[in-house]
């Protein structure tokens, strides 16, 4: 009989803090321990920013502080009374009368020793796993083997999950390579700001929903070879920015409704994935999911699709706002393996990877070559009136709402499906009140700089507090960007979401 591969089991207690309370609990991510030598080094000697970036106190000390007092004064002046000055609005027409972070605690066990699971369990705060990881192998760091997930299942009786890790044969002379395993999900670190700026009315809105839903792993990884059927979902975190025009009602409706419409569409796709293999690529699947979601919300706003109303069990066919009201929508689903961005309009999502700002959306402007051709082919006109505008009115070629400009202005989004990288620093979602006065690169560099400066000044917050609500470092970055945009002359509402993609930032000091 062939000798069975040795296995180690560990039991974890997880919290199902999602919108679907009845959904099974599963291990969503395990840390890839191919770099165990780095992970096991002394914490005081680590030069790690959770993505291969070295951060030293000297580096942070060099970050510039100039202009902060001027910005604070600008913000104070703006909040005390915004000037009602005419500017180039999006619309020239009728205006309607609004992760807990997981510490990387690692246990090295000799290959021949016995394991006691009770000794390997880390502290759990409010039912959420704060830290756990097991590496089985030789005591020498250089010889720690790569672990491979075989099973990640759920014990229905105890609401716990068991992970079985297959170990390389002790007689093997080489390490297992090329396998991908996941670390347990980290609560996202985010900060937001949304200010009226120099406008007479606030028409922006935003939505943040950490741990919003469970994403089928087949929508992210496909039928990955060697992946256990028990590892079925990853936790998705939702972020969205909506820049209204002609009034605030459409943006507000998108803020309250769009992520739930997305969850409904993903739930429908889940059923299809369970029943059959669609054979579609993941990009195509996400295109369909977000397009259906955006069209549903647009139909509800227009009154063509029934929508739920508070205090009534029946759905109503009633327009949310007048035909001249609309909104942009840029939303992001962030999970441990991918970022999925869907955009309709001229709000924007930008990823800072390494030292490069990577736009994950492209503004829908009427003078964009493909958009210009689409509008003209539909019988519309792009007229130059304080910039390119559809029929001289709307300064974007796609939006949710704006019934009076259909079919020239459409609610169909463009979707970007982006795998995560170790070098990912932060993700910025913002309305054009920011992007009109600052470019992608400077926004990303400033956001990262302010995050690092906050950590230099305040240190790392307690592990149990991270991920619970707004992250103060991200909030500092968002606030600073909004003040800087005002100082640079932004005339629009400004809404910004800063998401720190580094689960944990550590600094080494030089003596």
Curated annotation (Swiss-Prot):
InterPro entries according to UniProt: PP2C (IPR015655), PP2C_BS (IPR000222), PPM-type-like_dom_sf (IPR036457), PPM-type_phosphatase-like_dom (IPR001932)
Name assigned to this protein: Protein phosphatase 2C 16
Molecular-function GO terms, alphabetical: metal ion binding; protein serine/threonine phosphatase activity
Lineage: Eukaryota, Viridiplantae, Streptophyta, Embryophyta, Tracheophyta
Keyword rRNA-binding: no
Required cofactor(s): Mg(2+); Mn(2+)
Summary of the function given for this chain in its UniProt record: Key component and repressor of the abscisic acid (ABA) signaling pathway that regulates numerous ABA responses, such as stomatal closure, seed germination and inhibition of vegetative growth. Confers enhanced sensitivity to drought.
Binding residues annotated for Mn(2+) 1, in chain numbering: 243-244
Catalytic activity: O-phospho-L-seryl-[protein] + H2O = L-seryl-[protein] + phosphate; O-phospho-L-threonyl-[protein] + H2O = L-threonyl-[protein] + phosphate
Gene Ontology cellular component list: cytoplasm; nucleus
Gene from which this protein is expressed: HAB1
Pfam families linked to this entry: PP2C
Protein species of origin: Arabidopsis thaliana (Mouse-ear cress)
Induction note: Repressed by MYB44. Induced by ABA.
Record comment regarding domains: The 'lock' site stabilizes the complex made of PP2C, ABA and PYR/PYL/RCAR receptor by keeping receptor 'gate' and 'latch' loops in closed positions.
Signal peptide: 1-22
Family: Belongs to the PP2C family.
Cofactor binding annotation: Binds 2 magnesium or manganese ions per subunit.
Regulation acting on activity, per entry: Repressed by PYR/PYL/RCAR ABA receptors in an ABA-dependent manner.
EC number annotated for this UniProt entry: 3.1.3.16
Span of domain PPM-type phosphatase: 189-501
Residues the record marks as site: Lock: 385
Keywords in alphabetical order: Abscisic acid signaling pathway, Cytoplasm, Hydrolase, Magnesium, Manganese, Metal-binding, Nucleus, Protein phosphatase, Signal
Gene3D superfamilies named in the record: PPM-type phosphatase domain
GO biological process: abscisic acid-activated signaling pathway
Tissue distribution of the protein: Expressed in seeds, roots, stems, leaves and flowers, especially in meristematic tissues, guard cells, embryo and siliques.
Protein origin, superkingdom: Eukaryota
EC top class named in words: hydrolase
